[in-house]
Curated annotation (Swiss-Prot):
It comes from the Bacteria. Belongs to the TRAFAC class TrmE-Era-EngA-EngB-Septin-like GTPase superfamily. TrmE GTPase family. Homodimer. Heterotetramer of two MnmE and two MnmG subunits. HAMAP family: GTPase_MnmE (MF_00379). GO terms for molecular function: GTP binding; GTPase activity; metal ion binding. It comes from Pseudomonas syringae pv. tomato (strain ATCC BAA-871 / DC3000). The lineage of its organism: Bacteria, Pseudomonadati, Pseudomonadota, Gammaproteobacteria, Pseudomonadales. This is tRNA modification GTPase MnmE. The gene is mnmE. Binds 1 potassium ion per subunit.
Length: 456
């Protein structure tokens, strides 16, 4: 793939002062720049220590020059790295010297973009570079590294290859009707289709776990008024983020707190108490609470363990059952264990539902059980060598592919329509291609790489 022949340069290390700072150059002028600044042509892939000089020969700094001729470099072009002292003034003088020699200032993410355009890495791998830099936990960093090494891309490529094989079979049968292949009676197409759907479902589930580790899990605290929801928010946040009183309906709007548990990002949402009310303001709060419940990754249903209705908490608010997307996303919190006499404990029922008895206000007893549970929900220390990082756009593409395959299967089994199945298979393949960049618009590429750091 052709890329612009301009030479680009940027400071590749973080802003501020440090022991070492790096100026990176990529493009056809990288070798000329190296020779002009160091006074000699560096031997490829060897570290050369010496002075860095300006146009008059005055020394700007001393450091190490590394030269990588293309295509054996990160970007696939000639690349020069000048590693000097990490002061911002020194680095800026060195960068200005590179620009003076014909380079232009790189856009954010342009080095990674050129690596993608030169087939040095695919789009998912390029995004993994940014994810690795921005990782907020060791687990997220490990997942990002696996994506950078191609684990996620390989899973997508395997799915794509199976789709291509299926498309070849289906479209050949359509193009050569004299063969009289009956898709349903044959059974081969349906078997292949179900195999791809099952594998795609597994990848989607694993990608969802990777996205939680990267972006953070949205945890909604829901329940009746005065169940202790705001107290639980404050306990998790470690500060008085929400007003707590004995008056029912104190919380009338959605409150959001961003917290970390052992480096794992969580977006905790406190909501208005769920009850019938004639108060217009509180009614709006209840509606917003139900909306937040529908969008949550995990729901903490808080009940007052001292209340009689605590024995059947899911019957407290029928609309809650209608609103929650998946019962498996709900964790029951029996609060006020210090008053009810409940033992501080985490229990898992036969059907997998988790109940935690704790006290949000009495020294936060049981809070550590909740923290460990939330970490487990995010996949903390539960990953394997096949785990990888993923982004929301990856999940959207995987869901689009899954929906297309589901629709195609319906077309095949209900109408025997091979032509319509072929179109659904094409759309599924295109959706998967958007993940790795096999099918990507210029606008999409621009949005992705512009979110990177300058110098990456």
């Amino acid at each position: 793939m052709n890329v612009p022949r301009e030479t680009i340069a940027a400071i590749a290390t973080a802003q501020g002062r440090g022991g070492v700072g790096i100026v990176r150059v990529s493009g056809p002028l990288a070798g000329k720049t190296a020779q002009a600044i160091t006074g000699r042509m560096p031997k490829p892939r060897f570290a050369h220590y010496g002075p860095f000089a300006d146009e008059s020969g005055q020394v700007l700094d001393e450091g190490i020059a590394l030269y990588f001729p293309g295509p054996n470099s990160f970007t696939g072009e000639d690349v020069l790295e000048l590693q000097g002292h990490g002061g911002p003034i020194v680095l800026d003088m060195l960068l200005q010297r590179c620009l003076q020699l014909g380079s232009r200032l790189a856009r954010p993410g342009e080095f990674s973009e050129r690596a993608f355009l030169n087939d040095k890495l695919d789009l998912a791998q390029a995004e993994a570079i940014a994810d690795l830099i921005e990782a907020s936990s060791a687990q997220a960093a490990r997942n990002a590294l696996r994506s950078l090494q191609g684990v996620f891309s390989q899973r997508v490529d395997n799915l794509t290859e199976k789709l291509i094989s299926l498309r070849i079979y289906v479209e050949a049968a359509i193009d050569f009707p004299e063969e009289e292949i009956d898709f349903l009676a044959d059974g081969h197409v349906l078997g292949m289709l179900d195999d791809v759907r099952a594998e795609l479902s597994t990848v989607l589930r694993e990608a969802g776990q990777g996205a939680l580790l990267r972006d953070g899990m949205t945890v909604v605290i829901a329940g009746r008024p005065n169940a202790g929801k705001s107290s639980l928010l404050n306990a998790l946040a470690g500060r008085e983020a929400a007003i707590v009183t004995e008056i029912a309906g104190t919380t009338r709007d959605v409150l959001r707190e961003h917290i970390h548990i052992d480096g794992m990002p969580l977006h905790v949402v406190d909501t208005a108490g769920l009850r019938d009310t004639q108060d217009q303001v509180e009614m709006i709060g209840v509606q917003r609470a139900l909306k937040a419940i529908g969008e949550a990754d995990r729901i903490l249903l808080v009940v007052d363990a001292t209340a009689p209705e605590a024995a059947d908490p899911f019957a407290l608010w029928p609309e809650f059952l209608e609103q929650r997307p998946d019962p498996a996303k709900v964790t029951l919190i029996r609060n006020k264990a210090d008053l009810s006499g409940d033992s501080i404990a985490l229990q898992t029922s036969a059907d997998g539902h988790v109940t935690i008895s704790l006290s949000a206000r009495s020294g936060g007893e049981g809070l550590e059980l909740l923290r460990e549970h939330l970490k487990a929900c995010m996949g903390y220390e539960q990953t394997s060598e096949s785990s990888f990082s993923a982004r929301r756009r990856h999940l959207e593409a995987l869901r689009h592919a899954s929906d297309s395959l589901e629709h195609g299967r319906a077309q095949l089994t209900l109408a025997g329509a091979g032509e319509l199945l072929a179109e659904d298979l094409r759309q599924a393949q295109q959706a998967l291609g958007e993940i790795t960049g096999a099918f990507s618009s210029d606008d999409l590429l621009g949005r992705i790489f512009s979110s990177f750091c300058i110098g990456k």
